[in-house]
Amino acid sequence: MAKKPTQDFESTLKELEAIVSHLETGELPLEEALNEFETAVKLVQQGQERLQKAEQRIQILLNKNDQAELSDYE
């Protein structure tokens, strides 16, 4: 089976939101709900990986410019 090409972060987030909404209805049969949950877990992992890569890129860019400083978002 061919691997599904990875989506951009925004598409991943939209698909995850749709799955959550679908699951929240409580109207899915158990097996379908489990399949949706499994898909959601994979999407969360993809999203986290993308965010980590973005953070690494930001760190690299900031390290090239020693005047810039990364601070926690409040």
UniProtKB/Swiss-Prot annotation:
Top enzyme class of this protein? hydrolase
Which InterPro entries does the entry link to? Exonuc_VII_S, Exonuc_VII_ssu_sf
Its UniProt entry gives the catalysed reaction(s) as: Exonucleolytic cleavage in either 5'- to 3'- or 3'- to 5'-direction to yield nucleoside 5'-phosphates
Gene Ontology molecular function, alphabetical: exodeoxyribonuclease VII activity
Q: Is Cytoplasm included in the keywords of this UniProt record?
A: yes
Protein's GO biological process: DNA catabolic process
List the record's Gene Ontology CC terms alphabetically. Answer: cytosol; exodeoxyribonuclease VII complex
This entry's Enzyme Commission designation comes to 3.1.11.6
Q: Which UniProt keywords apply?
A: Cytoplasm, Exonuclease, Hydrolase, Nuclease
Q: Where in the cell is it found?
A: Cytoplasm
What SUPFAM superfamilies does this protein's entry cite? XseB-like
PANTHER family for the chain: EXODEOXYRIBONUCLEASE 7 SMALL SUBUNIT (PTHR34137:SF1)
Q: Which HAMAP family match?
A: Exonuc_7_S (MF_00337)
Function of this protein?
Answer: Bidirectionally degrades single-stranded DNA into large acid-insoluble oligonucleotides, which are then degraded further into small acid-soluble oligonucleotides.
Quaternary structure and interacting proteins, as annotated: Heterooligomer composed of large and small subunits.
This chain belongs to the protein called: Exodeoxyribonuclease 7 small subunit
Organism of this sequence: Actinobacillus pleuropneumoniae serotype 5b (strain L20)
